[in-house]
């Protein structure tokens, strides 16, 4: 069985946080004999300060399933979407994007959006756009964790998110595997305890299709390349041209002007 998690974060300020979460998912999955990969969306590079970016974790039972799931720009049927800043629930406008992508757009039917926030799920839901299917909204009580590109704010947000994911998507990673991965990677029992508490305390509520922000996300219809041909393309000169009245032979192509 294949599962995927996307982590939406603020570029530069939360880059390390996003990568630590997705890497932790894969490390935990390996403890269960599964295979996985953690990667960033290449369209986000180079990241801009505060501009939304994404990191992904894909877990599968074998290499064949994993490779089949990775043959795309970004996973589009995620089990869990993590927003490590609750303002991202208003929608994601990445720097290489044109328009606003709802936070739950790439979350599968019945999947979960997990946000770190000091607000209740009901308050966070007001910012989330409606979805045609039922989904779940989960909240970990926390303020947004911001740091820098080279300096990491080790406030346990990463392990708390990992603990919550074990609760929300046990088919991907179980709590015992998350705890084992934390011990091996960070060797900190306090972080193990933080993950366990997040597993127990994460708030979850079901969301119906008629709940949430009813506004239509704005988008731009950009012209196709062939519609801008006059401004983008200089027609090439034919390699050779036939000569009228000649039987065979040719003359070199030349610019008529």
Mark where each language-model region is:
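Active-site cofactor/cluster-binding pocket
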Residues: 1-256
């Amino acid at each position: 069985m294949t599962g995927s998690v996307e982590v939406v974060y603020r570029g530069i300020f939360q880059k390390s946080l996003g990568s630590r979460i997705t890497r932790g998912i894969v490390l935990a999955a390996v403890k269960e004999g599964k295979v996985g990969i953690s990667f960033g969306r290449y369209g986000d590079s180079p990241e801009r300060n505060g501009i939304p970016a994404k990191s992904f974790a894909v877990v599968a039972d074998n290499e064949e399933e994993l490779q089949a799931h990775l043959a795309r720009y970004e996973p589009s049927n995620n089990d869990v979407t993590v927003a490590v800043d609750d303002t991202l629930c208003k929608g994601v406008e990445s720097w290489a994007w044109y328009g606003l992508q709802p936070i739950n757009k790439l979350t599968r039917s019945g999947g979960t959006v997990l946000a770190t926030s000091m607000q209740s799920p009901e308050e966070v839901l007001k910012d989330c756009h409606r979805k045609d299917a039922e989904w779940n909204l989960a909240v970990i009580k926390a303020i947004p964790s911001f740091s820098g590109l080279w300096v990491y704010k080790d406030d346990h947000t990463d392990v708390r998110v990992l603990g919550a994911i074990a609760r929300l998507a046990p088919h991907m990673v179980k709590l015992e595997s998350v705890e084992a991965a934390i011990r091996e990677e960070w060797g900190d029992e306090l972080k193990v305890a933080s993950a366990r508490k997040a597993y127990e305390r994460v708030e979850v509520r079901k969301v119906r299709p008629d709940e949430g922000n009813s506004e239509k996300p704005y988008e731009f219809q950009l012209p196709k390349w062939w519609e801008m041909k006059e401004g983008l393309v200089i027609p090439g000169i034919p390699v050779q041209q036939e000569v009228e009245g000649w039987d065979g032979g040719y003359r070199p192509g030349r610019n008529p002007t």
